[in-house]
């Protein structure tokens, strides 16, 4: 068995663990970081950047957002079922965090909104001097390089299995490397940054009541089994209710070019399995609100319905709602993308020549769907005439 020692051991090599390891080292501690994956960064490698409030980017862009405003919005949204002190501290420290990352060489393209009605708090990491995907990987690399400069020791492909307790106090961790060799790390403090349990259907079922693949679909980032939560609980940590943020998305993520998901996320008619409209489609730009609405529908399913006239309009003037994740230059090949998706037997995309045919494909009563569409069109005509 290999034995190591440090002032602080960090469990998890995502942005939380990387940031914690750098900060601890800057404060003068010797640090060992143990990471289950073979590379650092975690799911954030697919991300584009963190939140910031009161930053110079926002000031330059004349963004009117303050810690107090953001805090009220967040607490209103969560109905105060979160740790208010933690949320406030997170927002208060976000400006310094952005500057801290900049000191490591991270460049930000600016502060942006995720969707039109949101606030411009999303600080997107510059990729080749502009906006691109996976800027989070650049940020994570910068933190790791800074950590190495400060003497942080990184151990990838190393799974922590247990927190060592002595006389009621944390004394380190037990882990195994890729070869199966046990590693004992003695430390004065253990920082857990292992993320959630999205890749653990059992935890999701037991703690939240959802059956994965049936009434709930998630990203299920490989390796997010809830190990850190389990180890903390075994060590005697206090617990709270486990929550999950619901968003809406097509169950099959292999949707081809961006034009398909981006087009189906537009505020067009959405119906449930009964053929009934159940949401103000303007809210579709907020994936969480829409996810909440879909979650209480029969079979937790919603269908977004488009016709050729809508597609023609999008081709002429562009999409109504865009974001930096799904932002195709145009949707000129939309029909071909749909045909290709259907030919590939994608179970979540349908195409029909009539409302009745579509209803039968979706398992909806044709008369009910016809009535809903007629009512929807009447309301659109009434608005256009005003």
Positions of PLM-derived features:
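Conserved redox-cofactor binding core of oxidoreductases
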Residues: 40, 92-183, 200-204, 379-386
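Glycine-rich active-site loop/strand segments that organize a redox cofactor
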Residues: 52-89
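Conserved Rossmann-like nucleotide-cofactor binding loop
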Residues: 16, 39, 276
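An anion/pyrophosphate-binding glycine-rich loop and adjacent beta-alpha core
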Residues: 229-231, 235-361
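Glycine-rich FAD pyrophosphate-binding loop
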Residues: 26-46
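N-terminal Rossmann-like FAD-binding beta1-loop-alpha1 element of flavoenzymes
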Residues: 8-33
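Contiguous C-terminal substrate-recognition/catalytic subdomains in enzyme active sites
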Residues: 346-386
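Glycine-rich loop(s) and the adjacent beta-strand/alpha-helix scaffold that form part
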Residues: 178-181, 185-252
């Amino acid at each position: 068995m290999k034995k190591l020692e440090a002032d602080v051991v960090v469990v998890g090599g995502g942005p939380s663990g990387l940031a914690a390891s750098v900060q601890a080292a800057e404060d003068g501690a010797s640090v060992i970081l143990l990471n289950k994956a073979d590379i650092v960064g975690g799911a954030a490698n697919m991300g584009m950047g963190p939140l910031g409030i009161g930053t110079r980017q926002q000031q330059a862009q004349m963004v009117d957002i303050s810690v107090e405003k953001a805090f009220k919005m967040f607490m209103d949204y969560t109905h105060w079922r979160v740790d208010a002190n933690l949320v406030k501290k997170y927002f208060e420290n976000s400006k310094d965090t952005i500057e801290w990352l900049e000191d490591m060489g991270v460049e930000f393209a600016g502060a942006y909104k995720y969707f039109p009605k949101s606030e411009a708090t999303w600080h997107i990491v510059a990729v080749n001097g502009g906006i691109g995907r996976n800027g989070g990987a650049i940020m994570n690399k910068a933190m790791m390089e800074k950590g190495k400069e400060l003497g942080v020791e990184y151990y990838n492909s190393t799974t922590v299995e247990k927190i060592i307790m002595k006389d009621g106090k944390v004394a380190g961790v037990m882990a195994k490397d890729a070869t199966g060799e046990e590693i004992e790390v003695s430390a004065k403090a253990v920082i857990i940054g292992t993320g959630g349990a999205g890749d653990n259907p059992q935890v999701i079922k037991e703690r939240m009541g959802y059956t994965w693949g049936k009434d709930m679909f998630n990203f299920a980032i490989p390796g997010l089994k809830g190990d850190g939560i389990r180890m903390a609980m075994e060590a005697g940590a206090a617990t709270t209710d486990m929550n999950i943020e619901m968003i809406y998305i097509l169950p099959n993520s292999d949707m081809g070019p961006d034009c398909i998901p981006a087009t189906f996320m537009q505020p067009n008619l959405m119906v449930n399995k009964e053929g009934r409209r159940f949401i103000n489609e303007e809210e579709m730009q907020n994936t969480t609100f829409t996810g909440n609405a879909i979650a209480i529908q029969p079979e937790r399913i919603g269908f977004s319905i488009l016709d050729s006239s809508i597609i023609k309009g999008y081709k002429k003037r562009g999409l109504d709602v865009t974001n930096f994740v799904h932002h195709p230059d145009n949707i000129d090949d939309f029909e071909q993308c749909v045909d290709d998706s259907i030919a590939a037997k994608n179970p979540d995309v349908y195409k029909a020549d009539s409302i009745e045919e579509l209803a039968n494909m979706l398992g909806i009563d044709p008369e009910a769907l016809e009535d809903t569409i007629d009512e929807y069109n009447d309301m659109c005509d009434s608005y256009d005439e005003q």
